[in-house]
Structures are given as C-alpha cells and as structure tokens.
C-alpha cells in the first residue's frame, strides 16, 4: 500500500495471502497541512526578518551556502502489521523505528534566540541523530476491543535514547570551552579569531568577557574542587601545557623583578658609600657649616647653589667662591655618573631577560600546534599576541645587545655626561672671567710693570724691556735678552726664603755653613736678599725638603714654597703668645720673621696670614 497526495491510504488490490507478514504501509507527511501549520505559528513582525528563508541544520543553526546538503528534512516512519488481516482499513500498525528531524529549512524561528555559526563543526549530513525513539503497540494501551477506529490505537514507549546537546565555544587565545546547552542558549558569535587589527584595550575587554563567560559555568571559588580538576581534560594538551608554561614564566618574571629591584637598592647604596672619590668629596663637604652642606643636596644647578649660599653664607661665598663652585660641580657630576652606571646596568639586565624570553618563544614556536579554524591560525600566535610575551616581543622586535654593543652604549652615555659637564664648566668659567675682567686687566698691568728681579712668568729665559713707537704711540715690549741668555738664567724662587720653586731646598744643603754660623740673622738677610732665607736652617728635615717642593701663590701674585706656607700658618698661633715670651724669640724663630703678616716682597703690603690668601698651584 502507499499514500496518495492527500495522505489517504488505499489498497493496491494485490494478494497478501501468500506472505501476510510482509505487508508494509509507508506514510508520508502532508506538505500542505504542514505549511498551513507553519503559517499559523509564524510570529507577527513589524520589520522583515532576514533570517526567514535561510537553510538550517538539525540543530536549527544556519547552514553555510557551500553546504552539500540541499535536501529538505522530513520525517520517515516505517511500520509493519503485527498480524495478518485482509481488511486494509482494519490493520493494526506496529511502529518499530522513528527518525525525527524536527526543524526544516524554512521552519519556524524563535525571535528571542541567538545562533552561532561554528566553523569548527562538520556538515549537517554527518551529524549524529540527536534523538532516537523506538515504540511498540503490542503491549500497554493497545485497544483490543475489536474497534477498527484508527484514532483509538495507542503506543507504548519501550526504549528512548537521547543525546545531550553540547555546544563548543571559541574563547580568546585559540582556546575552546565545551558546555551543555540547548540551541536557544548559544551566545552570539564573537570575533575572537581576528584580533590582529584590534587595540590593546579591545583585546583586554575581550579577555575579560571570556573570563565572565567561563565563570558562568565554573565558579572561581570551586577551582580546587574535584569537578573543576576533572573538567580540564576537555582542553587540548597543547593549551594546558601553554598555560602551565605561561604561569611558570610569569612567576619567574615577578620573582626576578623583585630580586632586581632589591639588588638595585643595595647596589645603589654600595656605589654611593664605597666610591672613593665620592667619599672624599663628602668629607670635604662635611668641613663646612650645616647650611652650606644642605645647599649641596638641595641645589640642582650651579646658579641655584650660588643663590642659596648668598642667602645663608655670603661671607663664606665671597672668600671661597671658586672652591665651593668647583666642589659642587664635582659632587653633582659624581652623583650623575653613579646614576648613569646604575641605569646602564639595569638596561643590560633587561636586554638579557628579553633575549632569554625571545629564545624560549622561538623554541615554543618551533613546536606550534594548529587548530581547525578557517584560517588555520596557530595557537602559539594567539598566546604570544594576547599575553605579555607578545606585547614585549612587539616592543623588542630586534635581537638583544651584545657585549660590545653594551660597552659602546655605556661609553656613549659617559661621553654625553662628560660633554654636558664640560659645557657647564665652560659657562661657569666664562661668567667668572666676565666678572673678574677688570681685576685681570689690573693684574696684567701690574705684571707688566714689575720691579727689577721680579717676573710674572716661570720662564727661565732672561728678558729685557724695549720702548718702541707704534702708530705714533710709545709702547714697552718685553723681548728675550740673547746676550744674557748665554751666561745667565732666571730662576723663580720663594719670596720669603729664596728656595727654587718646584725644586725646593737643594740636596747638597745640609745646614748652615761655617761662614754663616757666626753671622747674625740680620746679616744673613742682607746677604741673601730674602726676608727669612733657608740658609739659616741648622739642619733641614725630610719634611722641610718635601714641603719646599710645593708652590703657593698669594692673592697679590707673589709665590711662596710649601714650607713657608706651613710656617705662615703656624705663625698665627705663635703670634698669640704673651709678649714676654714672644720677645725672647730671636732671628728665624720669631713668627714675624718666618711668617710675616704682610707680603715680604718689595712695595707689597698685602695680607698673607688670613685664610684663603695662599692657594697651591701645580705644574
């Protein structure tokens, strides 16, 4: 038997008494009746629904246009008669198998549901039947009262096999999460696989969204439970391994960062405390008053340092201006150099760390795993792009610095610091020269008019003065005396004792000679033409010889040896003795003779005992 277009059953008048058990009835659904039902159930929409007319698969998902399945889904029912009966309209039907596909290509649409087109899923023709029901009418509520009405037939469900619908979600970083959900619970699709053109803020927002989606199914507080531990097997092994490596790298990076910060503090303290040069500078700073010491640390420039000293210690600034300015410049330069060394060290450590991470990233990339996406992107690319490693790799695209590059980089920083120090020093010197130009011109004029026997130069060649007329004006010039240069030599000596500057007391001098032993001190002064000649020493010590080799210049321009400088400084204390004891001192033992208050040079009355009047010079 078969059904006509209206679904009514008719007999084909074929004999069935040969094999009555093989009578089969094939029932097809009525398309017109199904269409009327669908039209009655269609929702009323105020705007056209663009989803109407698109084909769907068995799970009511939109099917791609290139899908091979183009046949409508329909229900097939296979039935056979339980016992032979020659009356076609009185047959008893046994349904032994039913295959139901509940959604057609143009079936009804739930407007409140959202759908996801998962590229990872195979075609609809390979899907397993979501539900299988087998029924039998031989037992249960079967009507055996002889009534031939088909509406009185009953069905007994003897077996039901259902498949729990599972949905696979694509998460950021190439990860997947398989959850149990119905077709109406599938979330809307996200563009996780195309993040290369997104900004950092957008990627962070997507990661947060994925975290919230994960928390919907697994609570954070239950991460240590057995259910959470057992559920991790749903993730691929490559993703689990990448997660473990990422957590280990992050923990190592945090520990290394903390250790580096601690080392920086310790090394910075050690550099400041152990630097010999900086320690000596600090000792020199400690010799000043607290106000001046605080100015060294508070001032950030030389001009600010000068302004602070003018307010707190104007007298000290006037007396020791050059020394304070040089000390401040040296102190700031040393601090800046220590800072540069620390910064270079930190840069080297950071470069080594980035180089090590780049090597690890290359090793991971060598064994990358591809997922089944449309573009077959690498999971390693997702992890490197979304994680901190990918961000650092974009910042540090090139290889790490080598040892030679690090040394050159360090030397460039040091050269830059030195150049800036030289520029600052030149500016300071230029300002000082402009302020003291009038005094310098005065000194040059006095140096050009020195009396006979005095010179403003350490040149030993004899000079002579000549008067010439130039442009109608008379001028005096100094030229070399060639005749005297053959037989004589000018030697710069100390104005107080007569020792040669830079050479000191001669090595062959062992003490006062026999000829000078009986001569008075005044006689020796008139003989050697010096205020307190070194020939009056009874026996020079090694300290006297060493000190006499040093050279000091007074503010008036006259030179003294280091031995006389020490004796002048000692004369300050000696001059405070009682007058009776002071009157008992004679000759070279009297402080006014070996350490006078005024400069002993001819026609010079400048003070030399006060502090800062004598300054050492070096050749």
Curated annotation (Swiss-Prot):
Biased composition annotated in UniProt, kind: Low complexity: 11-21
Gene: SLX5
Main location: nucleus
Disulfide bonds: none
Compositionally biased spans, kind Polar residues: 70-90
Highest taxon listed in the record's lineage: Eukaryota
Domain remark text: The region between Ser-201 and Leu-335 is required recruitment of SLX5 to ub-hotspots via interaction with EUC1.
Its EC number(s): 2.3.2.27
A GO molecular-function annotation: transferase activity
Region (Disordered) location: 1-23, 63-90
Subcellular location per the Swiss-Prot or TrEMBL entry: Nucleus; Chromosome; Chromosome, Centromere, Kinetochore; Chromosome, Centromere
Keywords per UniProt: Centromere, Chromosome, DNA damage, DNA repair, Kinetochore, Nucleus, Phosphoprotein, Repressor, Transcription, Transcription regulation, Transferase, Ubl conjugation pathway
Pathway, per record: Protein modification; protein ubiquitination
Enzyme class: transferase
The name this protein goes by in its record: E3 ubiquitin-protein ligase complex SLX5-SLX8 subunit SLX5
Sites of Phosphoserine modification: 14, 29
GO process annotations (BP): apoptotic process; DNA damage response; DNA repair; protein ubiquitination; telomere maintenance; ubiquitin-dependent protein catabolic process
Gene Ontology terms: cellular component: chromosome, centromeric region; kinetochore; nucleus; SUMO-targeted ubiquitin ligase complex
Subunit structure: Component of the heterodimeric SUMO-targeted ubiquitin ligase (STUbL) complex composed of SLX5 and SLX8. Interacts with sirtuin SIR2. Interacts with KAR9. Interacts with EUC1.
Region spans: EUC1 interaction domain: 201-335
Disruption phenotype: Leads to severe mitotic defects that include aneuploidy, spindle mispositioning, fish hooks and aberrant spindle kinetics.
Catalytic activity of the protein: S-ubiquitinyl-[E2 ubiquitin-conjugating enzyme]-L-cysteine + [acceptor protein]-L-lysine = [E2 ubiquitin-conjugating enzyme]-L-cysteine + N(6)-ubiquitinyl-[acceptor protein]-L-lysine
Physiological role: Component of the SUMO-targeted ubiquitin ligase (STUbL) complex SLX5/SLX8 that mediates ubiquitination and subsequent desumoylation of sumoylated proteins and proteins containing SUMO-like domains for their degradation. The STUbL complex SLX5/SLX8 stimulates ubiquitin conjugating enzymes, including UBC1, UBC4, UBC5 and UBC13-MMS2, and mediates the proteolytic down-regulation of sumoylated proteins. The STUbL complex SLX5/SLX8 is involved in ubiquitin-mediated degradation of histone variant CSE4, preventing mislocalization to euchromatin.
